[in-house]
């Protein structure tokens, strides 16, 4: 995390350029003004990339949106929750397994049932690991408390690359630059060994303002051993 270093670096910058200015260096003020202007513009766009759509009348492609990682998670939880409801109709309780600590935490936060149970009986778990990969390694495992239950294994797929002519298509408002779903992947071996059956329910799009922002691949896992 670079955040703690930002303020000290600003102080170092001021000390350096103040000394140069006092020594008679030229163009310090013009360069400072240019830097502040460019920085203000970039920060404004980076903190609200929807402005690109308002300025150009074209939404920024999701693959290029730096805010993609912080958007669409409530909708992702809704998509996962809908699949959970379908599996729960089979009559067994359903818990969730995330392939990454990020998606595990996001589902815990945005699914009301998971958020309500997080302190006493967690509903969302991180996939098992032999060594500590994150804080979830130290939490109780679902293998201890959810035997004979069903589960959803959720992982986010990487968005495919934009085609080489995406800029021209984007400029002409041709939706052909919109990316197709990534190919399905097989379930991990450890997951197959833990359940009686593991079924890939498909690649589920997560929309934000009408554009696919994420794809999540969801596996229906039945009867934990």
Positions of predicted regions on the chain:
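Luminal/periplasmic acceptor-recognition loop/helix of membrane-associated glycosyltransferases
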Residues: 62-225
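Generic hydrophobic alpha-helical segments
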Residues: 11-12, 51, 87, 114
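Weak global preference for isoleucine
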Residues: 2, 15, 42-45, 55, ...
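A short small-residue
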Residues: 57-61
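Signature aromatic-anchored transmembrane alpha helix within multi-pass, membrane-resident enzymes
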Residues: 18-56
């Amino acid at each position: 995390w670079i955040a703690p270093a930002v303020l000290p670096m600003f102080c170092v910058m001021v000390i350096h350029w103040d000394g140069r200015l006092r020594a008679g260096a030229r163009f310090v003020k013009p360069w400072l003004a240019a830097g502040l202007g460019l920085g203000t513009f970039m920060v404004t766009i980076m903190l609200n990339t929807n402005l690109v759509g308002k300025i150009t009348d074209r939404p920024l492609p999701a693959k290029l949106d730096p805010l993609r990682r912080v958007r669409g998670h409530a909708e992702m939880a809704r998509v996962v929750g809908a699949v959970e409801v379908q599996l729960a109709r089979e009559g067994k309780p359903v818990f969730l397994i995330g392939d990454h600590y990020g998606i595990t935490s996001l589902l815990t936060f945005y699914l009301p049932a998971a958020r309500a149970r997080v302190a006493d009986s967690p509903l969302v778990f991180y996939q098992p690991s032999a060594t500590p990969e994150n804080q979830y390694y130290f939490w109780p495992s679902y293998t201890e408390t959810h035997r004979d239950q069903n589960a959803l294994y959720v992982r986010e797929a990487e968005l495919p690359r934009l085609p080489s002519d995406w800029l021209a298509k984007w400029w002409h408002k041709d939706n052909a630059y919109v990316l197709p779903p990534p190919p399905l992947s097989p379930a991990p071996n450890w997951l197959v060994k833990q359940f009686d059956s593991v079924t890939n329910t498909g690649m589920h799009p997560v929309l934000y303002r009408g554009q696919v922002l994420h794809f999540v691949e969801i596996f229906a896992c039945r009867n934990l051993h």
